[in-house]
A protein has these predicted regions:
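Conserved ABC transporter NBD signature motif
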Residues: 27-30, 53-54, 60-79, 140
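The feature captures the beta-strand-to-loop junction immediately N-terminal to the Walker
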Residues: 38-41
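Q-loop/switch helix immediately C-terminal to the Walker
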Residues: 80-83, 87, 92-109, 119
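Conserved ABC ATPase "signature" region
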Residues: 101, 115-135
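Hydrophobic anchor residue at the start of the ABC signature
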Residues: 155, 183
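ABC ATPase C-loop
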Residues: 158-159
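Conserved catalytic motifs of ABC-family nucleotide-binding domains
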Residues: 162
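Catalytic Walker B motif of ABC-type/P-loop ATPase nucleotide-binding domains
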Residues: 166-170
Length: 265
């Protein structure tokens, strides 16, 4: 359904010269919510995310993407969306605050000094880096932020753009389980507080991370095996004869299921 301010996808397809990579992928996302795109390796998660972010790779796109009912063009993307890549692209020698000073100056040049400082502190607070704001990002040669805090900083830099839609590629990849839970927790809070759409790909979420999703789309061989409320996924698969065992990780159960049993009809 195309509700106001929803981000609908209508029968998206992606193809190369050899084969179709996605088949009639449809759905919608509302502001203030987090959509997780799940699927085993090769299911089409990266291809779908590339299409949503208008990346010209992974084949020839077909279909429609709309935001607020309007076509999601490159101009619209630059105006309303931001992306966070799987691997952080930070300046090792700059502090958390330095990164956000540059980001706010770039994306919000109209702000005066006082408003700019307030925006920077709001971003730092929104990702929980208040006590790390003077720490350098660091790298393998320079001590700095932990992997989880680097991911938080990358998200804060993207939020400086004040997007209506935020895309993230594997935001919990490469961080420990505690950091993964915290990242998904504050993403959910950010979506609600700023009334933005957050769409992320996730490979194999533990139950504690899965609990942070509002909605999820499960892909298998480029097709949608499930799209709906995350907390209704187990019930749906039970209704079609695949009842999850008690106390199981629903995401893990479903990913194992679609990896071996889901076939297109």
């Amino acid at each position: 359904a195309e509700g106001k301010a929803a981000g609908p996808l209508d029968k998206l397809k992606g193809s190369t010269l050899d084969k179709d990579l996605l088949h009639d992928v449809s759905g919608s996302v509302n502001p203030g919510s987090v959509l997780a795109i799940l699927g085993p390796s090769g299911a089409g998660k990266t291809t779908l995310l590339n299409m949503l972010t208008l990346e010209k790779k992974g084949g020839v796109p077909q279909g429609h993407i709309r935001v607020d009912g309007a076509p999601f063009t490159l101009h619209k993307y630059n105006e309303t969306a931001a992306s966070v890549e799987q691997f952080d692209t930070l300046w090792a020698s700059l502090t958390v605050k330095d990164h956000l000073v540059h980001a706010v100056r770039l994306y919000q040049p109209q702000l005066d000094a006082a408003a700019r400082d307030a925006a920077i502190q709001d971003l730092i607070k929104s990702v929980g880096l208040e006590d790390q704001q003077d720490v350098k990002a660091g790298n393998e040669f320079m001590r700095g932020l932990s992997g989880g805090n680097k991911r938080r900083l990358s998200i804060a830099v993207a939020l400086a753009k004040r997007p209506s839609v935020l895309f993230l590629d594997e935001p919990t990849s490469g961080v420990d389980s505690a950091s993964a839970v915290m990242i998904m927790s504050f993403l959910k809070k950010i979506a609600e507080a700023r009334s933005i759409i957050i769409v992320c790909t996730i490979h194999q979420p533990p139950a504690s991370v899965f609990a942070g999703f509002d909605n999820c789309m499960v892909l298998s061989m480029g097709r949608v095996a499930y799209f709906g409320k995350a907390d209704s996924m187990g019930e749906y698969f039970a209704s079609i004869g695949n009842t999850p065992p008690p106390d199981t990780n629903i995401a893990e159960f479903v990913l194992d299921l679609v990896n071996t049993d889901f076939t297109p009809e």
